[in-house]
């Protein structure tokens, strides 16, 4: 008997029903009872196994990005950037790398409507020859807070009230009134882009600054941008209500049906490049995640294209168990000093261990598609076959050795050990610039959203005044229009 042939896979299904241990099941409808009326006997092993498996089917949902959909495809380099990075998957035009991509909403539960106003996740896992590279981003280029110390509170404020389980504006406005840097993200959150028509018609951003390093060890800061070839489309509030009431999975269905029909979604990848020597030349901190880089000074440079041409085979195995981690990088790519990114490196791996288990990287959807070797061993649900006698390094009995060193950016850091904010906060300028770039009807929708939120009966006069002050500092006319509709005067 070829024992390796029958590893767990639907490819080796038997023609008849069996237990988990492979024993035949001749009746899948009736429990084993004493007579036709019962009682049920505990010795009905298949009944117990079936029920026990059923009640353990679900794993903890993601604390954020619980609602999502995935698809597979490839990334192809279209423009040479080998002068910027030694990353193998970016080595030359024409190089293709298999990927899996997951789109999601951020705040709400796994079964919530995909039409709800929310930031969308846009995460791409590149299965490169040098290991996995996870670019874990969103459909907006900034985030609410620049320091991860506030991240748990940020998500709790956005999530439903723990008493009533209802999302309420007064909670959101109360918390973020203490974070003036959040206004720039609200200029996206309350804008049309947080009601995307579907996943195919939205942009993606790496959000954080990263570093690309070339063979000579020269590093540049970069930001990643995904641009959909079919354009960006959004819904109005009324359209979102109608779509959500018709089909709460409309974006998942659109993605799945489009790929099945051969209408493959495609995005172009662009980068912005900044020389580290230029970081202090701006009136904001370029490593502040609440800021964007000006495209007139740092223009978008084309890199490649992402094509999703294959639907996943199993939603649970390749969406629910799919695990991303910003800590997964490859030679030629490195982190920046962005405070939020630095913390995500730990938090994402930790949440996957809690959600899926300590050996989540052994799952096929998460495992690298290249040869790999380490001495991380055993643990719950370990299913990796190992027959080594040496489980330590270094050893004269094991030929494994450390990998050849690849370039990483050198950095000399000095400073006091302290808890503090960055010196160049500049919290309102970019929010105002974004507002002024819109057509009048788009500005009006943004103002209406603020009026709706600030009209929450539990939003106090103090909270309203703070937000009108923030809006006025971003754009005086915007703050005045919101104030006039609320009959609240700005307090500057």
From Swiss-Prot:
GO molecular function, one term: heme binding
Active site, per annotation: 65, 138
Keywords tagged on the record: Cytoplasm, Heme, Hydrogen peroxide, Iron, Metal-binding, Oxidoreductase, Peroxidase, Peroxisome
One GO CC term on file: peroxisomal matrix
Enzyme Commission (EC) number: 1.11.1.6
Subunit structure: Homotetramer.
Residues involved in heme binding: 348
Organism: Capsicum annuum
Function: Catalyzes the degradation of hydrogen peroxide (H(2)O(2)) generated by peroxisomal oxidases to water and oxygen, thereby protecting cells from the toxic effects of hydrogen peroxide.
Protein name (database record): Catalase
Cofactor (UniProt): heme
GO BP term (any one): response to oxidative stress
Family matches, as PANTHER family: CATALASE, CATALASE ISOZYME 1
SMART domains: Catalase
Stretches of the chain forming a coiled coil according to its record: none
Protein family: Belongs to the catalase family.
Reaction catalyzed: 2 H2O2 = O2 + 2 H2O
Subcellular location field: Cytoplasm, Cytosol; Peroxisome matrix
Induction: In roots, by aluminum and salt. Expressed with a circadian rhythm reaching a maximum at late in the dark period or early in the light period.
Enzyme kind, highest EC tier: oxidoreductase
Tissue: In stems, leaves, roots and developing fruits.
């Amino acid at each position: 008997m070829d024992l390796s042939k029958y590893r767990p896979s639907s490819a080796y299904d038997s023609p008849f029903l069996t237990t988990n241990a492979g024993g035949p099941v001749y009746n899948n409808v009736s429990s084993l009872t004493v007579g036709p009326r019962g009682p049920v006997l505990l010795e009905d092993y298949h009944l117990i196994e079936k029920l026990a498996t059923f009640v353990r089917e679900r794993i903890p949902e993601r604390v954020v990005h619980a609602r999502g959909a995935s698809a597979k495809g490839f990334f192809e380099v279209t423009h040479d950037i080998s002068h910027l990075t030694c990353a193998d998957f970016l080595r030359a035009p024409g190089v293709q790398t298999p990927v899996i991509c997951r789109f999601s909403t951020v705040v709400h539960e796994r079964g919530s409507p995909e039409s709800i106003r929310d930031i969308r996740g846009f995460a791409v896992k590149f299965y490169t020859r040098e290991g996995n590279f996870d670019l874990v981003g969103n459909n907006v280029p900034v985030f609410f807070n620049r320091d991860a110390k506030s991240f748990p509170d940020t998500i709790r404020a956005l999530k439903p009230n723990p008493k009533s389980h209802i999302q309420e504006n007064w909670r959101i406005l109360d918390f973020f009134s203490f974070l003036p840097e959040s206004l720039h993200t609200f200029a996206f959150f309350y804008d049309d882009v947080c009601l995307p028509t579907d996943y195919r018609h939205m942009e993606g951003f790496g959000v954080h600054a990263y570093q690309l390093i070339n063979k000579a060890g020269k590093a540049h800061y970069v930001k990643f941008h995904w641009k959909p070839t079919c354009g960006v489309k959004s819904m109005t509030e009324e359209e979102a209500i109608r779509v959500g009431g018709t089909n709460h999975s409309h974006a998942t269905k659109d993605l799945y049906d489009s790929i099945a029909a051969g209408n493959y979604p495609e995005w172009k990848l662009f980068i912005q490049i900044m020389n580290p020597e230029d970081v202090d030349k701006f009136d904001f901190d370029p490593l502040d995640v609440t800021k964007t880089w000006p495209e007139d000074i740092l223009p978008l440079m084309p890199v490649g294209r992402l094509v999703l041409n294959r639907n996943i085979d199993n939603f649970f195995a390749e969406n629910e168990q799919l695990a991303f981690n910003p800590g997964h990088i490859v030679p030629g790519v490195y982190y920046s000093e962005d405070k939020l990114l630095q913390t995500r490196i730990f938090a994402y791996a930790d949440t996957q261990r809690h959600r899926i288990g300590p050996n989540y990287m052994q799952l096929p959807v998460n495992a690298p598609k290249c040869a790999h070797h380490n001495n991380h061993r055993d643990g719950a649900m370990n299913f990796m076959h190992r027959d080594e006698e040496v489980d330590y390094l270094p050893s004269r009995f094991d030929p494994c050795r450390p990998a050849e060193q690849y370039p990483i950016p050198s950095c000399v850091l000095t400073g006091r050990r302290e808890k503090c904010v960055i010196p160049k906060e500049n919290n309102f300028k970019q929010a105002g610039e974004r507002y002024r770039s819109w057509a009048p009807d788009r500005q009006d929708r943004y103002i209406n959203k603020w009026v709706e939120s600030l009209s929450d009966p539990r939003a106090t006069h103090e909270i309203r005044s703070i937000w009108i002050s923030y809006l006025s500092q971003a754009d005086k006319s915007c703050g005045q229009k919101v104030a006039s509709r609320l009959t609240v005067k700005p307090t500057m």
